């Protein structure tokens, strides 16, 4: 064994040790650390422990631990998992509404004081402490820089990710590239100028790659774009390959889609250190963390044993590699709740059909949390380290407002639904005879017609002629806007389709309610100018915005009420929309309203978002998943939807008789 090999092995051991160190973490726990509870029935607390039985109405003492609770009964002390505990016991009423913050992992500085100390000294020499003035910002900066390959910065919105990205780019050795959405490039340049940083370059062309600065900025759109139309595969990312040591991806959750052009461009850079900065890193499902972890931490490693296309690393491989699972298969077995899936989906987690419950398997929930602990540095707005310096309002998510149908709208919806129903039954029968599963892509494409019939009926082809009057949902939205304005608030309405927003705007104009329609139909520069003039520095009473243009980098604390005209299939879209208003400058309590047409697709989408949000919170923020509710799958919803058509027809006939 040569000296060179020994040193290489030592370096690998140090890398594994430092990459495997969990980031410092505080989490919010419901209840209190220790409390009294009463048994609902006589039952076994733990099948693996002798004597772990409790009598009905027996009072016990419960102490919270990582895997659930330690329960002190008359017969001794026994371990009890979270779901079993709440199925057997009723906590004291005083405990239900209580909560506390708990340190799950200590700051890395406690284990590596010299290394973190050196990084803090370097940051001070660079003057970074002059603009990262809050303790948690410097602490997190040094913890992120401590990781030799990279990490995910999961700071929630408005905690200072832009300045953190600049600071990290300066602190790390070598040239750094900050990649962001095109509409945010000018804001990042303004921030650099404000901080007095001159050694930076905005990369727009091949020529710019020849003379790079310490900090370099490029948009995702330019990075993936071909230099010359004649060579479509020769992108700007390929010219930057190996010229950049560190890459920082703002709103890098888009890497969850490994097949997108943006993701391919980022992987192409070949940077030594890779960072993702995103307040909602998983756009939809907790499983999307696998692709993000592979990008920042590598694959098939001791600290990140999963892989996207390779194997799964475990200790038993020292003895035998027989029956070694792939990284995807093992990740799916542990964390993904599937009832069935095609091989295409199992191989990629992105393409192909499946029936999935948005939930991390309860048996592996603690394992998932331990896996992400060294990969993501998480901060939320309400935790003590943040609230020492700044406070954020907690948005109130109101129960959905169920809206009754207007007769003509209901007739249109039923016609569209029947067309979908006939196609669906025929498609299901045909695929069954062929021994194939249903085509999810085709179903979603057809179902889009039902979405439009419910939310944008004037655009439905074949039936839209003459149906230009306001729907009951649009009337409910306008009434809600007026109600909020009467309270002295400035609401923002989110919708998927700009047609809806223009219809609402026309009606508000008749009422002399000033409003701004903010959609992708205008250029970035034009709509930003309107936003500044009429909302930020103006007095327009209402903002009508499409989901697509308000996802990130938009601060709207001057608005203070949220109305979602329709739901989104992506939890990130709704979360980002709501949190545009949640800023330190927000002076009002923010309420969020959701409009649902009774029995329509709105109800399924609302359920889907709820489950996705709870699953992501359970994995990242130690939230609690509930087993008390059953998830209504897409096909079950479809059949319930189809079976409701005769009832809808009866309602139409009854309404017609009343009208006569």
Predicted segments, located by residue:
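Charged, low-complexity
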Residues: 1-151, 214-223, 233-234, 242-245, ...
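Conserved Helicase C-terminal RecA-like lobe
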Residues: 130, 164-174, 386-417, 429-543, ...
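Walker A/P-loop
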Residues: 148-168
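Conserved Walker A/P-loop ATP-binding site and its immediately adjacent core
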Residues: 164, 173-196, 287, 496-498
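Inter-lobe coupling linker of SF2 helicases/translocases
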Residues: 217-218, 222, 237, 256, ...
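Conserved RecA-like ASCE ATPase "motif II neighborhood" in helicase/translocase motors
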Residues: 218-246, 254-265, 545-548
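Conserved RecA-like P-loop NTPase helicase motor core
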Residues: 256, 514-608, 612
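A conserved SF2-helicase RecA2
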Residues: 569-575, 582-659
